[in-house]
Structures are given as structure tokens and as C-alpha cells.
């Protein structure tokens, strides 16, 4: 029960941070830049309103994998020991997993280890997001098509899976070039530019996250019951 509560709190905290960005952006562009800087690694000083919204959606989508779905999977497979091993790898990646001059040597290992841990969960997350889109009135079919087409449109082998599902479900385009530590990193776009993102898309993304997490919890519980009966 404590572990399930921990997962719920992780999703809740992520949703609260994303909602904080939405509210800050309603106040001013500068407030939005400052607030989104709490949840993204990219430089935020010159972000436009659109870029702030996209950055927030991308962050929720990416962290849905490594902050919610992956821990659920590893806790189910190996209990607290495997769950905490994953958490340690994820934390190390967040701290030093940058492929720049400063962190190149140790950062490479941290980033690659995190890629391995999240390889399977990222794909599970994308599929569950496509399914979760339907009861929310989002476009699950387009989400699936976008995942099939754009799942490789990222420097990471995992990030674009959940981001493409989010882009397709919401009908917005994510990705593109970002600036990290003063250096521009060129990234492909994800999804179709059907319409510009709006503040309400952050709320839609949060709801998509919670329903996806619920589906994963049901899946894990179902598998556990089957194993127990065997």
C-alpha cells in the first residue's frame, strides 16, 4: 500500500507542477518561464508561450514513463529492491545524465543506464496512453498513428514513445530544437502541427497521465493475480 501511495504521489506532484506552469503563464510570460524552469532541463530564459506549453507537455509525458510506469513495473517484477534500484538509476540520470562537455564521461553511462531501464516501460506507456485517450475524448487513433510514425524522433530511444502518444492524442506538435547550457540541440519534431497548444492542454495531459497510470495499475494487479493463482 505504501508503494502504491508513493506512485500516486509521484503522479500528483508532477501534475501539480505542470498546473503551476499553466497558472504562471496566465500571469505573465516571464512567470511561465521561471516556473517551467523547475521541471525542465533546457534553458528557459527565451522560451515563447508555445515553447513553454510544449515543454510542460513533454515533461509530463516523459516523466509518466520514468516516474510512474517504470517504477510500477519494476516493483511488480522485483519488489522494493528492484524498484529502488531503478529509482537510483533514474536519479543519477537526472543529476548528471547530460552528454555535454562537463558531464561527458560520467553522464554517458548514467544516460545509457537509464535508457536500458526505461526501454520496455516506454513502449508500454505509449500503448496505454493511446488506450487512455479514448475515455477522455482525445484522439486515441491519431495517438497510435503518431507513435508508429514518430517514436524514433528523439535523441533518446525512449522519450519519443510517450511524447508522440501525447502529441497525437492532443493534436499538437512537440519536439524541435532546444537550448541546453547555452548550446542548441537539434531534435526532430513529434506529431502534426494541427493547432497551437493552449493552456488547457496541460490539464488534458495531466488527465491522460492519471488514466494511463490507472490502466498500468490494473495491468500490474491482473498479472499479479494470475501469477498468484499459478
Regions found by a protein language model. Give the residues of each.
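Hydrophobic alpha-helical transmembrane segments
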Residues: 1-85, 89, 97-230
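Solvent-exposed interhelical
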Residues: 94
Amino acid at each position: 500500500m505504501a508503494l502504491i501511495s508513493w506512485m500516486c504521489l509521484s503522479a500528483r506532484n508532477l501534475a501539480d507542477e505542470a498546473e503551476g506552469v499553466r497558472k504562471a503563464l496566465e500571469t505573465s510570460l516571464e512567470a511561465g518561464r521561471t516556473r517551467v524552469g523547475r521541471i525542465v532541463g533546457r534553458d528557459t530564459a527565451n522560451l515563447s508561450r508555445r515553447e513553454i506549453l510544449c515543454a510542460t507537455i513533454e515533461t509530463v509525458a516523459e516523466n509518466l514513463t520514468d516516474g510512474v510506469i517504470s517504477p510500477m513495473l519494476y516493483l511488480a517484477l522485483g519488489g522494493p529492491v528492484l524498484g529502488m534500484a531503478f529509482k537510483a538509476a533514474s536519479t543519477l540520470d537526472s543529476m548528471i545524465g547530460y552528454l555535454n562537455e562537463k558531464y561527458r564521461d560520467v553522464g554517458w553511462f548514467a544516460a545509457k543506464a537509464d535508457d536500458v531501464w526505461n526501454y520496455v516501460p516506454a513502449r508500454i506507456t505509449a500503448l496505454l496512453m493511446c488506450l487512455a485517450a479514448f475515455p477522455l475524448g482525445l484522439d486515441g487513433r491519431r495517438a497510435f498513428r503518431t507513435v508508429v510514425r514518430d517514436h524514433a524522433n528523439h535523441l533518446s530511444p525512449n522519450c519519443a514513445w510517450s511524447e508522440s502518444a501525447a502529441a497525437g492524442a492532443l493534436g499538437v506538435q512537440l519536439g524541435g530544437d532546444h537550448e541546453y547550457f547555452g548550446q542548441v540541440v537539434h531534435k526532430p519534431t513529434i506529431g502534426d502541427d494541427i493547432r497551437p497548444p493552449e493552456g488547457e492542454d496541460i490539464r488534458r495531459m495531466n488527465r491522460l497521465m492519471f488514466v494511463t497510470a490507472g490502466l498500468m495499475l490494473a495491468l500490474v494487479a491482473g498479472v499479479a493475480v494470475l501469477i498468484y493463482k499459478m
